Design a protein with these regions (language model features):
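His/Asp/Glu-enriched, well-ordered alpha-helical/loop segment
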Residues: 117-204
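Acidic, His- and aromatic-enriched active-site or binding-groove loops in soluble protein domains
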Residues: 1-4, 64
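Short secondary-structure capping/turn micro-motifs that flank functional sites
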Residues: 100-101, 179, 212
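C-terminal cap of metal-dependent C-N hydrolases
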Residues: 192-227
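Alpha-helical elements of the RecA-like P-loop NTPase motor core of helicases
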Residues: 51, 183, 211
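Active-site core of metal-dependent hydrolases
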Residues: 8-138, 144-145
């Protein structure tokens, strides 16, 4: 379920009891339906941003892995907290918001490297585009003064930047946007190239441009041309 906004002035500010009940419902629904039953959490700019999740876990039988917090690179202090949180729970970084707010946002490719250096398991790190999501800009009084939109293509740009600028192996960068996401969300037919799974394949040239693309076994792009 989700996204559920917490630690954000735009959220409905769910109480600990409400959050527990909501995520417990997601868990039970996942068990009955053979799905992950995970709760995607929109993380806001409030201080101590993970506190609502910690409180829910401390007052229930829920585990940190039942929560999937996103926008964890939106400012320096949430990112620092994510380094500790990510050792036991999952951490999702947002690709499309940088360089929209470069004074606050942590560059997502750099964030991947820093999380790994801090001891966060690779399998706990994901990157999503938040494509078509809103990128609001507020003044000091909290008034909305402008609005932009995240782009789906940002995820590809960040993945390439992780390899070319941050010098991570391609297989590491690819895992953050493929197999890690599929494993956490239990998307059994996604995230890997194996017999019996959906044949979703992106082929890149030496300059990391998409030359060919296959979706569920169907050729969608061949020799740089969309079919």
């Amino acid at each position: 379920i989700g996204e559920i906004a917490i630690s954000d002035h735009r959220s409905s500010c769910p109480s600990t009891a409400e959050l527990i009940r909501l995520v417990e419902h997601a868990r039970v629904g996942g068990m009955l339906g053979g799905k992950a039953g995970i709760a995607n959490m929109h993380m806001g700019d409030a201080r101590d941003p993970f506190r609502p999740i910690y409180d829910a876990v401390e007052n229930s039988e829920l585990k940190l892995t039942q929560f999937f917090p996103t926008h964890c690179n939106r400012n320096p202090y949430i990112f620092e907290d994510a380094k500790a949180y990510g050792k036991k729970g999952y951490v999702d970084l947002t690709a499309s918001s940088y360089p929209y707010d470069p004074e606050n946002e942590i560059k997502p490719s750099k964030a991947i490297v820093e999380l790994l250096s801090a001891g966060v398991p690779l399998e706990h790190i994901t990157l999503t585009s938040d494509g078509n999501g809103s990128l609001p800009n507020f003044d000091r009084e909290g008034r909305l003064i402008s609005m932009d939109m995240g782009l789906p293509k940002s995820i590809m740009s960040v993945m390439i930047d992780t390899v070319t600028e941050e010098n991570l192996p391609l297989e590491t960068a690819v895992a953050v946007v493929t197999s890690n996401v599929a494993s956490i969300l239990r998307l059994r037919d996604k995230g890997r190239i194996e017999p019996g799974k959906d044949a979703d394949i992106v082929i890149l040239d030496k300059d990391y441009a998409i030359s060919d693309l296959i979706s569920r076994g169907q050729m969608m792009t061949r020799n740089y041309e969309r079919l």
